[in-house]
Amino acid sequence: MEQRISIERMEQAVNLFGSFDENVRLIESEFKVTISNREGELRVNGEVEDTMLAVKALNALLTISNRGEPITEQNVRYVISLVRAGQEDRISELTQDVICISSKGRPIKPKTIGQKKYIESVLKNTITIGVGPAGTGKTYLAVAAAVAAFRERKVNRIILTRPAVEAGERLGFLPGDLQSKVDPYLRPLYDALFDMLGAETYQKYLERGNIEVAPLAYMRGRTLDDSFIILAVEQNTSCEQMKMCLTRLGFNSKMVITGDVTQIDLPADKMSGLKQAVRVLKDVEGIGICELTDQDVVRHVMVQRIIKAYADYEAARNEKRKK
């Protein structure tokens, strides 16, 4: 069977095919078809079902190209997963969702349907708990939402914090050199802020007190009004720490809690506060629980494969335990 797709501009074809035709080769390999570009048309040949799936994938990628975005391998693999699930039409939902503009003028957008739902939860709810594997953009998108709220004067401060169990953090115990110890653990937050604001603007807001980046234990005893609070990597908080963090919320504030329950560094006899919070707060009004999956990973494709392999391994182990 042969299907044809019209290409209006040469730039579309260049973007769609990718460097050394790698994007099209990936679709050919996935759906067992051949794709050629002749006289302003894409010609797709293969078995009927395979050809129809490949055409759906190509049309979805053209939707991405038409909105002026470069087509990457990650785009192609994500579109393929949507086509396999019969959800390729949902790619158009991502076209208008600009969260904020980076310091270099780049629009920050959700790249997957899961990320879109996550951002919608952040905007709708007072507290959002985002749970998912590494590389799903949990913290980065939360920082983007915080910067957008700050620029629109919806909040006066952005507060970012994360635990540092490896640095010896305990409630009520703050070693004098804790800040220097936890700086490496706060680096992902710094990087996201630098990308959104630029180093100079970040430093200016930091000096004014509009931005605060601090270890988790510094939050104790405070009430945080008019703030956008991000608690990152919260799988490493104890249940007591999590409750302490949640009760810091003040008036006109919003809180986002992110974590990956597969990367817990707490002692074996301690329950993760994040796990408990998801169970306890799932039905509380004003709190959104958003679960991202390996399909939402926007890092190197190998990261997605590794996450899936570990998930399959854990699922197999749990199945054996049940037996």
Give the residues covered by each predicted segment.
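Hydrophobic side chains in well-ordered alpha-helices
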Residues: 16, 23, 54-57, 242-245
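Conserved loop-to-helix interface motifs that mediate assembly, gating, or partner/ligand docking
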Residues: 85-106, 110-113
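Conserved helicase motor core of SF1/SF2 NTP-dependent helicases
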Residues: 41, 103-231, 235-323
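Compact, well-ordered interaction domains used in eukaryotic information-processing assemblies
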Residues: 25, 31-34, 38-40
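Short amphipathic alpha-helix segments
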Residues: 12-29
